[in-house]
Amino acid sequence: MATLFIADLHLQTEEPAIVAGFLRFLAVEARQADALYILGDLFEAWIGDDDPNPLHREMAVAIKSLVDSGVPCFFIHGNRDFLIGKRFARESGMILLPQEKVLDLYGRNVLIMHGDTLCTDDAGYQAFRAKVHNPWVQRLFLTLPLFIRRRIAARMRAGSKAANSSKSLDIMDVNAQTVVAEMEKHRVQWLIHGHTHRPAVHELSANDQPAFRVVLGAWHHEGSMVKVTPDNVELIAFPL
């Protein structure tokens, strides 16, 4: 019995080794799981479910194969793929979750999320996030021709990269008070998230009790997953 969590794969055709590693993960490790949760940024970018990118179709087929084998797959949107919609969910068999979800995992209440909402010290990013998560803005963007959406997405990624290069690492990490506030709001002692690309297990205090924040790593030179069993919560790095 095990439930698996991954995040921040940033899949793109320019990184075939990561794509191949994910396909192997779906075919091997994930097949033995009770469920798979993908906590955002599965893709490097997502400009709409109507994008004919062959990689998207390939990943939908692979995830659907996992689901059809009896392993449910759940997805929380990240900051790169927040426009993944019902069409891709239907094609892949994934179940879309809200940005915060509490799970009962073998007797543990665990809060899961992508993690970008915890980075409240980065006021510039939070303002940008509020704009692009506006439903009206999203509907307008999705009405644009694909070639225009691609240009806008490329410009936004370039702008984000430039902005991040001038920010301190502390600003781009989670805010400790926000973490505690979220855990106390949901009355949990466990939090699993991604986004920051800083894999670690942090011990803290919430609800006047010991608590734990487990951060998934990004898939670059190796894969990263959290494996939750009735007896343990493990952060695991593995070769791609």
UniProtKB/Swiss-Prot annotation:
Binding-site residues for substrate, renumbered to this chain: N79, R80, D122, S160, N164, K167, H195
Give residues annotated as binding Mn(2+) 2: D41, N79, H114, H195
**Where on this chain does Mn(2+) 1 bind?**
D8, H10, D41, H197
InterPro entries (UniProt xref):
Calcineurin-like_PHP_ApaH, LpxH-like, Metallo-depent_PP-like, UDP-diacylglucosamine_Hdrlase
Task: Give, as one word, the top-level EC class.
Answer: hydrolase
Under which EC number(s) is this enzyme classified?
3.6.1.54
- Could you tell me which pathway this protein works in? Glycolipid biosynthesis; lipid IV(A) biosynthesis; lipid IV(A) from (3R)-3-hydroxytetradecanoyl-[acyl-carrier-protein] and UDP-N-acetyl-alpha-D-glucosamine: step 4/6
Q: Which cellular component, as a GO term, is one annotated location? A: cytoplasm
Give the cofactor binding note.
Binds 2 Mn(2+) ions per subunit in a binuclear metal center.
Q: How does it sit in the membrane?
A: Peripheral membrane protein
Keywords, in A-Z order: Cell inner membrane, Cell membrane, Hydrolase, Lipid A biosynthesis, Lipid biosynthesis, Lipid metabolism, Manganese, Membrane, Metal-binding
Keyword Cell membrane attributed: yes
Supply one GO molecular-function term. Answer: manganese ion binding
Task: Name what cofactor the protein needs.
Answer: Mn(2+)
According to its UniProt record, which protein family does this protein belong to? Belongs to the LpxH family.
Q: What is this protein called?
A: UDP-2,3-diacylglucosamine hydrolase
Q: Whose protein is this, by species? A: Salmonella typhimurium (strain LT2 / SGSC1412 / ATCC 700720)
Q: What is the lineage of its organism?
A: Bacteria, Pseudomonadati, Pseudomonadota, Gammaproteobacteria, Enterobacterales
Gene of this entry: lpxH
